[in-house]
Amino acid sequence: MVQFSSIVQCTLLATAASAYVTSRQAAESLHDAFTAAGKKYFGNIAEQALLENPQNEPIIAADFGALTCENSMKWDATEPTQGGYNFDGADYVVNYAVEKGKLLRGHTLLWHSQLPSWVSQISDPATLTGVIQDHVTTLVSRWKGQIYAWDVVNEIFAEDGSLRESVFSNVLGEDFVRIAFEAARAADPDCKLYINDYNLDDASYSKTQGFVSKVGEWIAAGVPIDGIGMWLACLFKHAYAGGFPTSGAQAALEALASTGASEVAVTELDIGGATSDDWVNVVNACLNVEKCIGITVWGVSDKDSWRADESPLLFDVNYQPKDAYGAIIAAL
């Protein structure tokens, strides 16, 4: 009887999920509308648990054309011990994306956070160089030809526009950027290589200006930086910035594009307390900047967001689209 009940329950869940897929696919897709307007993708994040969620997955399948692993490609997930690689979570997302015909963004190869202690404790330049090269080469090679773009280095700038202190900058200075990008280029010459950061929402902000200046120098010097990604969370008040209005998003993207990078993207978008106008401002900003190729929203439902109390996403805690969803479709 217990087994029979379980079978019935699973059948009902599967039926409900199937109906949900149909209803979502019947709606106009954010990705389809965005690409019809001339852009490459409108994406979201994914992990195995999110893709196994019968409310979340149909929205991913219907509305979003590119996927970024939220955590499972980061260093602590992929190489928690030196040479001890684990790709289970990342492989699940990659296989899903390939099966569904979606683009993939790799996130991220070097980041000061979610970094295993065995890396952060390295003090010898030659050792750290080798570790960076091995890690980057291993990850990029594993999914060569499957990942459209990699965030090679992530959040490496401080709020004053200088390099952030980390094991990478403390041991190698700014040369770690070249080392990482060259290793990634060698591992997959056709993959787009990005530098990604946050608080770049305002073109006049000190961090944005320092970032633009330094990245422009690196590109001019031959560091193979193809793209710039920005976490655009305009209304989220960081420790060193009071939050920026979405009206400045276009000027910020134009400033990033001026570095000489071949493309820019909003790689992480969640806006705490946003109005529909805020979302439309960001979408229009990308539409109006030729080099802006896409937008990745950092989550589907507020229920699953790391900032759930700020209601930062396009779907509410019941996985229902908010007014901003319709406003974006209308704007496109």
UniProtKB/Swiss-Prot annotation:
Its main location: secreted. Keywords: Carbohydrate metabolism, Disulfide bond, Glycosidase, Hydrolase, Polysaccharide degradation, Secreted, Signal, Xylan degradation. Residues 45-331 form the GH10 domain. It is an enzyme of class 3 (hydrolase). GO terms for molecular function: endo-1,4-beta-xylanase activity. Gene3D superfamilies: Glycosidases (3.20.20.80). Pfam families: Glyco_hydro_10. It is found in: Secreted. It catalyses: Endohydrolysis of (1->4)-beta-D-xylosidic linkages in xylans. Its EC number is 3.2.1.8. Endo-1,4-beta-xylanase involved in the hydrolysis of xylan, a major structural heterogeneous polysaccharide found in plant biomass representing the second most abundant polysaccharide in the biosphere, after cellulose. This is Probable endo-1,4-beta-xylanase F1. It comes from Aspergillus flavus (strain ATCC 200026 / FGSC A1120 / IAM 13836 / NRRL 3357 / JCM 12722 / SRRC 167).
